[in-house]
Amino acid sequence: DNVDTYITFHGVESAMALWVNGTFVGYSEDTFTPSSFNITDLIVNGENKIAVNVYRFSSGSWLEDQDFWRFSGIFRDVELQMVPHIHLKDIKILTHLNENYDHATVEVTPMIEKKEAKFKAVYTLKYKDEVIGQKESKDCCSPINFELDDPHLWSAEKPNLYQLYVEIMDENGLVECSQHNVGVREFKLIDGIMCINGKRIVFHGVNRHEFSAKTGRTVSYEDTKKDILNMKANNINALRTCHYPNQTFVYDLCDEYGLYVIDEVNLETHGTWSELFDKAHILPDDKPEWLDIILDRANSMYERDKNHPSIIIWSLGNESYGGKNLYEMSKFMKQKDTSRLIHYEGLSHDRRYNETSDIESQMYTFAVEGTSR
């Protein structure tokens, strides 16, 4: 009676509808971010029937025209989660450094969901096995700060990680415990140069699709770890998740081993703006009916990935031309997060909203101006 049951689909291409014991639960699009459904009131003791209808094509397909192999189906994990009556629904972790980088504040903002119950939350920050600090709170949403002298900073060269433990207790004892990695770092532009902890970053990066020659879109943790270690062995220090959010453990590995990440929204509308079509067909462009859809995709990526120190840049997508909707997405992300930069390469095709991107880049830079070479 004191738990809720959720089912989470971490990757379904391109859309899905869910039934539990014959009752329709919901519908979801966005191939590359999780979809969760509360099924507490629909399950029974004993055997239950979960039915999923996967749609190869949907309205979301217009936004998923990436250059890759075409598949459909459930290709990432499916989880059943039993959530206690008091639990940590969300957590946001920010780190702030002084100008000398010898003092840091770790700011923890929880969102504890409770059902008319008294509780206490204990926040413990450790570095390796050493307890750095511990705080208690009976408030569900107020920030908790830890002050660190001479902090162990995170960078690709030295990916130091602290561990934050959150224990939630009621009058009967421990209800829930979770662990979160914390990378203390500051990423910002200094005189137009991208810097980590005050030092210039020289990027040696790659684009990486999440794909296996043997298992297609389903890529194991072990194979992913090999990829990350091969990158490190070859002096690669950055990757772009082209062209969609990857599995969560990709970012965990980048946090652990030290890679800078450009995390990219699942958005590419390549086929709508080629030379074969006029501008009336371009998506999402300025069309108001597409704005909420792309903002939802950006928000899903942000909320899932916001606490990873390895992510230093948010990418709004790939090869989706330009326009007001992408500009609105950029503003949305900047309101959510001021600790990272925003990138969108497609501005080189449409200069109406140059403020969309903090960074200027070109996908295919021509060596000779005015030619295809």
Cite the ranges covered by each PLM segment.
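N-terminal carbohydrate-binding accessory modules
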Residues: I91-K92, Y165-K232, D252
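Short strand-edge motifs at loop-to-beta-strand transitions and within beta-strands
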Residues: T33-F37, C140-F146
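Surface beta-strand/loop "capping" patches
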Residues: P84-K115
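Accessory beta-strand-rich segments of carbohydrate-active enzymes
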Residues: D1-K89, K115, P245-Q247, Y260, ...
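Substrate-binding/catalytic cleft of secreted carbohydrate-active enzymes
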Residues: I228-M231, A238-R373
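Beta-strand-rich binding/interaction modules
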Residues: V20, H103-S137, I144
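Short hydrophobic beta-strand segments in globular cytosolic domains
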Residues: V25-G26, I132, I201
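Short glycine/proline/serine/threonine-rich loop/turn segments at secondary-structure transition edges
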Residues: V3-D4, I43-E47, E147-L161
